[in-house]
């Protein structure tokens, strides 16, 4: 959903009463004439005609300005009010100043009843919005009280709650998925009615060491601390570069008017449940914020660049006599400038987005939020009652019709074609008709939107650069970023995640044009604990930290073309895990020999499987100490059956009689081990071969003849006792020099070795990371693939984390086994 149409700002269409003038203009011009004309007549004899004329103009000019002047949609008197309020009525500098609740009782002659009565009077005046002008930083914060459950009381009897929500993948989604998300977000906005104002807050703040990802690689008493130091340095460097330390968070604050907290709380809880239900339908994780979390959020908004952690407990209020605002207020606020303000040591500027475009893209908000700058983007949204909205639009259409008639009359009087109308009038007429149709038949609602951007920077030059950059993005989409002159205080307090709006600039929008400001970009993967580093998010430029063992399934695959860095990424994960989680073990199945140098550097065991290699793995090895309910001999018999089937070959594989004979021989070969005799030795393939020759069935001789090549023949690589250290923490099995005749069998035996090692580690309480490089080779042969899929499914249940790597993602996609992996 790249673009949606935006309705024209119909507030520019004024209702004309008489003489083609609005009611405001008639009153102002009439008042000017009622005062100015008598003044002219009375002073004409004394001052002369010219002097009296200038006097009359001087008297009438303020009324003319009052009638005609507008700035940012505000009439003349409100512009003047903002200037007077900022320059004279309110102090420009607000210092941090506490109002300890115990202080009044310490004064001489202070009576308890008098103090309580004064406190009630002050709270009552503030609740009605009639409190005195803010004299301190604490008094600038507009809320009245914050409750532990997250309910906040604001002036005017408004109670609000806040929900924090996370991102989902929108930017990289398909067109169909983007359309579905847009439709769901539109329905979400339509949930709010005219009695439920809400605020969307998008906060970019620069994080510091305490809030950044922690590099959890502790030192150990081994030979790898130098590697740990180097790897830790790399991680810290990447974390420092991740979006230059910008953390992005998203919140929605909603409020309801109520007589008191008892009435507001249950209603807010119902709304909160509905909001979180709507987020869940969008697959957006969300979390309600309690009172302390909301205070921590306000603290972060009012302490830009601060490294101080938020320290607060509800017990601190009665113990210290301080209010909650004393824990979150900044050191100072300075609103003396018309276009900027100071908060602590930081500079700030509040601007609003003037939407002039006829259509908007879903990239506008995303591009603003992707900037490397500290900022708060706020969208205060007030739903207009549907009947009232339709009535208003019909009134605008009627006004446009009157303007058309007036223009046509002028055309007739002037002698030109009355069908020629001003282009703006035609555009407004068309847009108003379309807007009415949208409201009546297309499930659209009307919203009043206040879109503000608060930029913060450590110095004024950086601030102006950031504002200029945001303005450039707005201009790119045919919008304008305009500074709130003499309204910096109102803009700043409106940006706080309280649901309180003092900015009077509103833009009429429909559901679709409001929903196009989609707050989703890309899902971040940030997990705590023993999380490993997996690179940088290409869209958000944040680090990816994940603990695969905490996911629903730890299975994973590295996919990519040749040279794309699959092996490098797997080695980085392997090294990170080796240094971070010392109790876990690693097995690498390496067909190309790429991992051997790293494994040797980590003190692991490299097993080279090749005809001329001194390393041997005995496929007959069996571990009898397995968990209850498991039969190791039955599992070994199943493996040897599949091995013999691979050796015998043919389209039909082993026949039932052959399987029976093999199973009988396996039980005979392992008889001494099963009985637990001290003289029992681990058998070899040779033992199975000889046992088959002793059987009377001719099917046994057929299988034995097939095994002869691998027992007494030239390919007897696996007819030796295991002579390598298989209990090392890191084991790498290299299959690089295997010929085609041995490769299938080697792969099969390797799978069995991995399965047994994982079983043993699981029995000892250790997790195993099994890396299968070029794993598509394991899926070429149906029999090998079948056994590998069975092993793959078993690994997850045994506490294994199996990463697989391949560049051939289309290897037999029609095969069910490939799909199973």
Residues of each region from the PLM?
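Alpha-helical membrane-inserting segments
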Residues: 35, 39, 43, 62-63
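Hydrophobic alpha-helical transmembrane segments
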Residues: 45-60
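Glycine-rich phosphate-binding loop of nucleotide-binding enzymes
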Residues: 13-39, 147, 152, 168, ...
């Amino acid at each position: 959903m790249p673009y949606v149409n935006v309705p024209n700002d119909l507030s520019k269409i004024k209702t004309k009463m008489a003489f083609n003038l609005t009611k405001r203009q008639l009153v102002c011009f009439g008042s000017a004439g009622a005062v100015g004309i008598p003044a002219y007549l009375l002073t004409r004899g004394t001052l002369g005609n010219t002097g009296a004329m200038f006097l009359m103009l001087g008297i009438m000019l303020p009324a003319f300005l009052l009638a005609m002047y507008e700035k940012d949609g505000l009439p003349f008197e409100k512009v003047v009010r903002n200037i007077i309020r900022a320059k004279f009525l309110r102090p420009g500098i607000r210092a941090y100043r506490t109002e300890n609740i115990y202080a009044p009782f310490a004064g001489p002659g202070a009576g308890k009843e008098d103090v309580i009565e004064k406190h009630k009077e002050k709270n009552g005046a503030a609740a009605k919005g009639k409190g005195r002008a803010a004299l301190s930083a604490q008094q600038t914060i507009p809320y009245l009280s914050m409750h532990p459950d997250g309910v906040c009381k604001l002036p005017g009897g408004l109670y609000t709650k806040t929900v924090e929500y996370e991102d989902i993948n929108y930017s990289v989604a398909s067109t169909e998925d983007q359309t579905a998300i847009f439709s769901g977000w539109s329905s979400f906005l339509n949930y709010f009615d005219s009695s439920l104002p809400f605020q969307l807050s998008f906060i970019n703040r620069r994080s510091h060491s305490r809030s950044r990802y922690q590099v959890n690689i502790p030192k150990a008493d081994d030979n790898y601390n130098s590697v740990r130091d180097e790897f830790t340095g790399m991680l810290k460097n990447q974390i420092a570069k991740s979006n230059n330390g910008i953390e992005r968070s998203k919140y929605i604050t909603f409020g309801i008017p109520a007589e008191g907290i008892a009435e507001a709380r249950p209603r807010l809880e119902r709304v909160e449940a509905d909001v979180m239900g709507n987020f869940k339908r969008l697959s957006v994780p969300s979390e309600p914020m309690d009172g302390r979390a909301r205070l921590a959020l306000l603290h972060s908004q009012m302490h830009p660049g601060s490294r101080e952690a938020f320290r607060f407990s509800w017990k601190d209020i009665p113990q210290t006599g301080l209010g909650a605002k004393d824990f979150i207020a900044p050191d100072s606020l300075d609103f003396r400038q018309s276009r900027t303000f100071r908060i602590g040591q930081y500079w700030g500027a509040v601007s609003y987005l003037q939407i002039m475009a006829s259509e908007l893209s879903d990239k506008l908000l995303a591009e603003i939020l992707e900037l490397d700058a500290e900022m708060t983007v706020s969208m205060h949204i007030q739903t207009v009652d549907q009947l009232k909205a339709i009535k208003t639009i019909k009134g605008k259409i009627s006004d446009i019709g009157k303007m058309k008639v007036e223009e046509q009359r002028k055309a007739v009087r002037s002698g030109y074609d009355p069908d020629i109308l001003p282009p703006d009038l035609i555009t407004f007429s068309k847009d108003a008709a379309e807007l009415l149709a949208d409201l009546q038949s297309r499930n659209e609602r009307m919203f009043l939107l206040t879109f503000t951007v608060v930029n913060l920077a450590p110095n004024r030059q950086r601030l102006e650069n950031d504002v200029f950059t945001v303005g450039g993005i707005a201009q790119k989409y045919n919008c304008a970023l305009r500074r709130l002159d003499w309204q910096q205080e109102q803009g700043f307090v409106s940006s706080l995640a309280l649901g309180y709006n003092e900015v009077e600039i509103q833009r009429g929008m429909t559901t679709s044009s409001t929903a196009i400001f989609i707050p989703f970009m890309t899902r971040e993967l940030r997990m705590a604990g023993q999380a490993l580093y997996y690179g940088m998010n290409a869209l958000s430029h944040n680090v990816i930290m994940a603990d695969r063992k905490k996911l629903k399934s730890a299975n994973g695959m590295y996919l990519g073309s040749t040279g794309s860095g699959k092996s490098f990424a797997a080695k980085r994960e392997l090294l990170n895990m080796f240094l971070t989680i010392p109790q876990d073990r690693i097995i690498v199945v390496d067909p190309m020999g790429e991992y051997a140098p790293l494994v040797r550097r980590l003190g692991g065991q490299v097993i080279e499987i090749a005809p001329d290699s001194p390393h041997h793995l005995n496929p007959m090895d069996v571990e009898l100490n397995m968990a209850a309910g498991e039969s190791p001999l039955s599992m070994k018999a199943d493996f040897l059956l599949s091995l013999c089937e691979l050796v015998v070959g043919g389209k039909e594989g082993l026949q039932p009689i052959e399987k029976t004979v093999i199973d009988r021989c396996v039980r005979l070969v392992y008889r001494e081990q099963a009985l637990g005799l001290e003289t029992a030795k681990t058998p070899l393939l040779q033992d199975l071969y000889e046992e088959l020759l002793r059987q009377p069935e001719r099917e046994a001789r057929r299988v034995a003849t097939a095994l002869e090549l691998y027992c007494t023949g030239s390919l007897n690589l696996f007819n030796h006792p295991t002579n390598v250290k298989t209990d090392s923490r890191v084991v790498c099995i290299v299959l690089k020099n295997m010929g085609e005749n041995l490769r299938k069998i080697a792969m099969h035996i390797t799978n069995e070795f991995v399965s047994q090692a994982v079983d043993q580690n699981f029995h000892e309480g250790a997790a195993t990371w099994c890396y299968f490089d070029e794993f598509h080779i394991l899926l070429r042969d149906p029999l090998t693939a079948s056994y590998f899929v069975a092993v793959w499914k078993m690994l997850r249940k045994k506490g294994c984390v199996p990463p697989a790597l391949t560049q051939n993602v289309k290897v037999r996609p029609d095969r069910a086994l490939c799909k199973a992996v």
